[in-house]
């Protein structure tokens, strides 16, 4: 490999690291900006757009970089903010965010068109919503019962206050969490498409 080619490759790697670091910092800040939607879903589940930077990273740098930003975001949050869930919430955020970003980036980078970007992002949001069911059912909610000492019946009761027919955890997750997670992903997709082009000079060399 020539010296110039080696230098160009190193410069590209440095640029990717810098962009990933910047997007991780932005994602970390966005984790603080969240709000409940109590009429639609229990108040302990909040809406945020902290998955947006990892989606940008997946498109601009590659699917693996989307996962890297997701990881760094949650590590920063756990270290600087602390955790009230024994890191269960951060683990859930990492798993679901990684599915979202990696899927979107993988599909986009196969053809790199606006259509593939949209297809990848929507597919990522849909897969994230589907994966949220086993992650919440087998990991997150049982862990919350242990960490907070709250009976599962009390958690289900919060869902039933909105929809009485949600009388078991699986019904709660399918009825509330899946559509909420999908719509949350679609919000990130919309914002990504609005800001990606203006940010392109920063994201790309």
Name each region found by the language model:
Residues 1-205:
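Loop-helix junctions at membrane interfaces
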């Amino acid at each position: 490999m020539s010296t110039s080619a080696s230098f160009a490759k190193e410069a590209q790697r440095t640029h990717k690291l810098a962009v990933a670091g910047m997007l991780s910092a932005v994602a970390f800040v966005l984790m603080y900006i969240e709000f409940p939607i109590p009429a639609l879903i229990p108040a302990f589940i909040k809406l945020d757009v902290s998955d947006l930077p990892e989606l940008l990273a997946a498109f601009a740098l590659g699917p693996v970089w989307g996962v890297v930003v997701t990881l760094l975001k949650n590590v920063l949050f756990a270290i600087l903010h602390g955790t009230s869930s024994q890191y269960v919430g951060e683990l859930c955020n990492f798993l679901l965010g990684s599915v979202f970003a990696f899927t979107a980036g993988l599909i986009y980078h196969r053809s790199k068109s606006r259509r593939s970007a949209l297809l990848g992002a929507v597919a990522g949001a849909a897969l994230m919503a589907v994966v949220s069911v086993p992650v919440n059912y087998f990991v997150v909610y049982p862990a919350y019962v242990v960490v907070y000492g709250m009976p599962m019946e009390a958690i289900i009761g919060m869902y039933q206050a909105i929809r009485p027919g949600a009388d078991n955890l699986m019904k709660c997750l399918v009825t509330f969490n899946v559509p909420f997670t999908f719509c949350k992903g679609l919000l990130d997709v919309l914002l990504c498409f609005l800001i990606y082009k203006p940010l392109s000079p920063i994201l790309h060399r």
